[in-house]
């Protein structure tokens, strides 16, 4: 493999032996994030023969490197390093201890040896024991998605016929660090081969050097102008709104309850109290209408008599005052005011029960043993079954959500846009100074369209007046690289970008450090 100033690593299979010269080939991994870690073990040292520390990733490759001198195979320094490819884990460890709880994954490993293993669903399916004379100290472990390859100190120690991204990796260690984590993405590369061996690499990473070399399939250029095209990777998106704020009224579901005129009395016990008008809330906003209760008389809890709702801190008259539930169900029943509510809650027929009198006949039977055949005054019982939560809210009126819109225009780069409902990609420039003296009429007074119907110029109300913006194509068909003295020195473009210099009817952008790396 080839390393490029810690910014990339390049792998190629030993069977890949092209003729001398430049060749476009995969296998390059560009570093996109670097972090370090000093230690992750407790005061007693790290645990060997086990995976105890892991960091989550979603990457084509992850390299974990120790300082140049490496780390010793001991509980005082290095214990375990691993690569997680989601379906299986590859790890390297050592374990010379014996006894209960020691070496939980590998079992006892001979002294002065290390173990390279692969595990799937808790079962080891690959084991390789290597003497430490081959790897005197731990220096690096790299996980690569291509054929799920794992490299220990630069040597390929595991591969399979699957290609999967790295989902997690980590080094469990006590001292000898720090460990440097390098997260990489896969890119194509233009490699220079001599006698079947790669001597230099140029990444096709969207940089000026990469665009020029990978488009022309060579790293050697004579002086001149080189037209090029590139597809812009759009990373940003903005929206231009017609309104500064928008009100959205969310749906309020109404549950209306009414008196049941033909309800039959219970015949003894709470299980014979028939339920009516059961309504169950799902998620959202609800209004429960109990207006018919105005002709009923609420009966407070009095030992066995009346209502029973210690788990509900509200009355039915106030249930719509913004209470949160998850879930909520309400039913009506007609039963004895004497004991009907309390016994229903004890029997888990409801969380809370509210009793109301309508001066009904004494036709309802008792609910307690010994009173099942006795007659008591019938009343209206309202059963509420609920748990507190965040999916259901009661309200007296619909909920209105106000969204405040801010027009933040992204300039001088290719972006995805949504301008007054029209979407597309473009390179946005501010043309207020050029347009201010003209009378621009627009699509509803806000935009000018070109012949294709796409937005050409649009206007936004700013703090100090109207601002005009022009939408240009993301790709400049007139752009050219400038090579002088064998070096990439600049770009000619028709766009007036930040830092550019006017040159006749075009603009020149100087490239700093545009020299291609020398071949090794």
Swiss-Prot record:
It comes from the Viruses. Specific enzymatic cleavages in vivo yield mature proteins. The precursor is processed into S1 and S2 by host cell furin or furin-like protease to yield the mature S1 and S2 proteins. The cleavage site between S1 and S2 requires the optimal sequence [KR]-X-[KR]-R. Cleavage is not necessary for virus-cell fusion. InterPro entries: CoV_S1_C. GO terms for cellular component: host cell endoplasmic reticulum-Golgi intermediate compartment membrane; membrane; viral envelope; virion membrane. Keywords: Cleavage on pair of basic residues, Fusion of virus membrane with host endosomal membrane, Fusion of virus membrane with host membrane, Glycoprotein, Host membrane, Host-virus interaction, Membrane, Viral attachment to host cell, Viral envelope protein, Viral penetration into host cytoplasm, Virion, Virulence, Virus endocytosis by host, Virus entry into host cell. Residues 1-520 are extracellular. S1 attaches the virion to the cell membrane by interacting with cell receptors, initiating the infection. Belongs to the coronaviruses spike protein family. This is Spike glycoprotein.
């Amino acid at each position: 493999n080839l390393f490029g100033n810690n910014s990339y690593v390049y792998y190629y299979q030993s069977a890949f032996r092209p003729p001398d010269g430049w060749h476009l080939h995969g296998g390059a991994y560009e570093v996109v994030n670097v972090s370090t870690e000093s230690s992750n073990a407790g005061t007693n040292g790290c645990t060997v023969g086990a995976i105890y520390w892991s960091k989550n990733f979603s990457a084509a490759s992850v390299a974990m490197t120790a300082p140049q001198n490496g780390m010793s195979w001991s509980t005082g320094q290095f214990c375990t390093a691993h690569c997680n490819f989601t379906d299986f884990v590859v790890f390297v460890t050592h374990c010379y201890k014996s006894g209960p709880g020691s070496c939980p994954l590998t079992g006892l490993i001979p002294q002065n040896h290390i173990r390279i293993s692969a595990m799937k669903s808790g079962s080891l399916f690959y084991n390789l024991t290597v003497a430490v004379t081959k790897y005197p100290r731990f220096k690096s472990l790299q996980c690569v998605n291509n054929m799920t390859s794992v490299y220990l100190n630069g040597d390929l120690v595991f591969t399979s016929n699957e290609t999967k991204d790295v989902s997690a990796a980590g080094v469990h260690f006590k001292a000898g660090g720090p460990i440097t984590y390098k997260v990489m993405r896969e890119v194509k590369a233009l490699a220079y081969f001599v006698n079947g061996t790669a001597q230099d690499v140029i990444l096709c990473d969207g940089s000026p050097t990469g665009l020029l070399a990978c488009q022309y399939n060579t790293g050697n250029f004579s002086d001149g102008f080189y037209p090029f095209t590139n597809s812009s990777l759009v990373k940003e998106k903005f929206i231009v709104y017609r309104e500064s704020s928008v009100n959205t009224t969310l749906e309020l579901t109404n549950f209306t309850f009414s008196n049941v005129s033909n309800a039959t009395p219970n015949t003894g016990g709470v299980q014979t109290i028939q339920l009516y008008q059961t309504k169950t809330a799902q998620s959202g906003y609800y209004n429960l209408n109990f207006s018919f209760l105005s002709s009923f008389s609420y009966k407070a809890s009095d030992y066995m008599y009346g209502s029973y709702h210690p788990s509900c801190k509200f009355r039915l008259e106030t249930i719509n005052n913004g209470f949160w539930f998850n879930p909520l169900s309400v039913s009506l029943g007609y039963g004895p005011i004497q004991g009907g509510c309390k016994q229903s809650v004890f029997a888990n027929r409801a969380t809370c029960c509210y009793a109301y009198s309508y001066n009904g006949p004494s036709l309802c039977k008792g609910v307690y043993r010994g009173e099942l055949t006795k007659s008591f005054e019938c009343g209206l019982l309202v059963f509420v079954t609920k748990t507190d939560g965040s999916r259901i809210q009661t309200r007296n009126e619909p909920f209105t959500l106000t969204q405040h819109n801010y027009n933040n225009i992204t300039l001088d780069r290719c972006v995805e846009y949504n301008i007054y409902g029209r979407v597309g990609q473009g390179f946005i420039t501010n043309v207020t100074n050029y347009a201010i003296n003209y009378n621009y009429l627009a699509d509803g007074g806000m935009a000018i369209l070109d012949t294709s119907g796409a937005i050409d110029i649009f206007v936004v109300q700013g703090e100090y007046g109207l601002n005009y913006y022009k939408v240009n194509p993301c790709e400049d068909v007139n752009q050219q690289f400038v090579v002088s003295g064998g070096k990439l020195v600049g770009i000619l473009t028709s766009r007036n970008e930040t830092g550019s210099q006017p040159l006749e009817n075009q603009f020149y952008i100087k490239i700093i450090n545009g020299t291609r790396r020398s071949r090794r």
